[in-house]
Amino acid sequence: MLDLTPTELERYRRQMMLPGFDEDAQRRLKSFTALVTGVGGLGGTAALYLAVAGIGKLILVRGGELRLDDMNRQVLMTHDTVGQPRVFKAKETLEKINPDVEVEAVFDYITPDNVDHLVRSTDITLDCAHNFAERDLLNEACVRYRKPMVEAAMDGMEAYLTTILPGQTGCLTCLFPEKPEWDRRGFAVVGAVSGTLACLAALEAIKLITGFEKPLVSELLTMNLGRLEFAKRRIYRDPHCPVCGNHAPWRQHVSRSLESQLRDLDVDRIFNLSRPI
């Protein structure tokens, strides 16, 4: 693992006071790359808290320009960037907040053409995409390459969160075999709601990477933040799931080259840090 500089030791001193969160945990954070999609009120805020916690590298993925009605929940943006690509301003802001974190900005949406490369370039994914088309692509790629994915979504005052470990838990398609209706521009949102969920998503990633607390594995956390009601329910892997099931198409058509790449992935380094329930 990478060593910590004197500046980093001082910067992260307060979180290293937590039981189980020692210098080794901090070095693990520094050695990890996280892919964050969306880079809005959810993804942008999650990226912020990963950056200040000391993640080694962030890959931010979001196409499109910033709109004025986005600004009620944007913590990385300023008014003068309305009409410009949000992902570059997010990179600039994060690098100013913590210059020790490497930030890569990808001005694009998640597509079939880029998803494999992006997922293979990272250790963990935070799925904060704004529609199920992108979420499904991320889910399939994370399962294919056995990369952990923190899944977070909200609409109005309601939100859900879970952590997906391919090979150990169900995937997003197990959870939502039929996709809910999702209006990408029409959903209601209060910035404090997306921000609350984003903080929990970032914390899930930090727990999974460092192992200092048990992550939300094989459970779905649902929240109604208007009434402050929280519930957990067990989720299961569907053996007939078309994405992660025993007979998923990618299992039957994987090439020898890809099989070799999968064996070379340092999956155990990630999975052994979690303690599945």
Swiss-Prot record:
Keyword Repeat appears in the UniProt entry: no
UniProt protein name: Protein HesA
Family in the record: Belongs to the HesA/MoeB/ThiF family.
Gene name in the database record: hesA
GO BP terms: nitrogen fixation
Entry-linked InterPro entries: ThiF/MoeB/HesA (IPR045886), ThiF_NAD_FAD-bd (IPR000594), Ubiquitin-activating_enz (IPR035985)
GO MF term set: nucleotidyltransferase activity; thiosulfate-cyanide sulfurtransferase activity; ubiquitin-like modifier activating enzyme activity
UniProt entry keywords in alphabetical sequence: Nitrogen fixation
Any single Gene Ontology cellular-component annotation: cytoplasm
Pfam families with a match to the protein in the record: ThiF
Annotated source species: Leptolyngbya boryana
